[in-house]
Swiss-Prot record:
GO biological process, one term: mRNA processing
Ranges where the RNase III domain occurs: 7-134
Keyword set includes Amino-acid biosynthesis: no
Species of provenance: Clostridium acetobutylicum (strain ATCC 824 / DSM 792 / JCM 1419 / IAM 19013 / LMG 5710 / NBRC 13948 / NRRL B-527 / VKM B-1787 / 2291 / W)
Protein name: Ribonuclease 3
Ranges for domain DRBM: 161-230
């Protein structure tokens, strides 16, 4: 069966063999899929738990590894490791979009490569590992998979300001009229997602999304940068 083969393939990539494979299935299920399949569980609750497991694991690591770094600096470095863009990079390395269950409509609109969907799914997978194997296994998994990201954060090598990079490139080409416009938001107040259009050359070049307006703007800039590369 194709779904079973894909699950085994992802388990191999993660280096985790699940006792309860349904946890992984739920972690890989987007809400759009559940909307079309009413008995399917989707991954939002796992995202919530995975975020907490990730935050604690990274916090504990930084606290023990760097006893002379101030609380404020530790907070900044942790934020770099756990931000949506970093999570998306991890998910891309796993080719996570290939395994996510989503509606046909979501897939047609680019859901398999959408930053927020991939990032949320990474958190859900972490939660699935935590529930299946316990905290120590989940923590060791995080420290292994995020090793490069952690090191880059410590060495201040993570650059997340896509807006500035895009502005520099466009200004070098004589384009200065760059606008970010909030077009809508959706979801409950505690989990509100924002959508922002990026405009230049009198045209909408990309639409970004994120759980803050700033993240949505950065996502839009990141997508526009990829478009410039193509």
């Amino acid at each position: 069966m194709e779904e079973e083969r894909l699950l085994e393939e992802l388990e191999s990539k993660l280096g985790i063999e699940f006792q309860n494979i349904n946890l992984l299935v739920t972690a890989l299920t987007h809400s759009s899929y559940a909307n079309e399949n009413k008995n399917a569980e989707y991954n939002e609750r796992l995202e919530f738990l995975g975020d907490a497991v990730l935050q604690l694991s990274i916090s504990e690591y930084f606290f023990k590894k760097y006893p002379t770094i101030s609380e404020g600096e530790l907070t900044k470095k942790r934020a770099l490791v756990v931000c949506g863009m970093s999570l998306h990079s991890i998910g891309e390395r796993w080719q996570l979009g290939k395994y996510i269950r989503m509606s046909h409509g979501e897939e047609l609109t680019g859901g398999r490569t959408r930053v927020s969907i991939i990032a949320d799914c990474v958190e859900a997978v972490i939660a699935a590992i935590y529930l299946d194997k316990g905290f120590d296994t989940a923590k060791n998994f995080i420290l292994r998979e995020f090793e490069g990201t952690i090191q880059n954060a410590v060495e201040n090598k993570i650059i997340l300001d896509y807006k500035t990079r895009l502005q520099e490139i466009l200004q070098s080409k004589g384009k200065t009229d760059i606008k970010y416009t909030l077009v809508r938001h959706e979801g409950p107040p505690h989990r509100r997602k924002f959508f922002v259009n990026l405009n230049f050359d009198n045209d909408v070049k990309s639409t970004g999304e994120g759980y803050t307006k700033k993240d949505a703007e950065q996502d839009a800039a990141c997508k526009a940068l990829k478009g410039l590369d193509n």
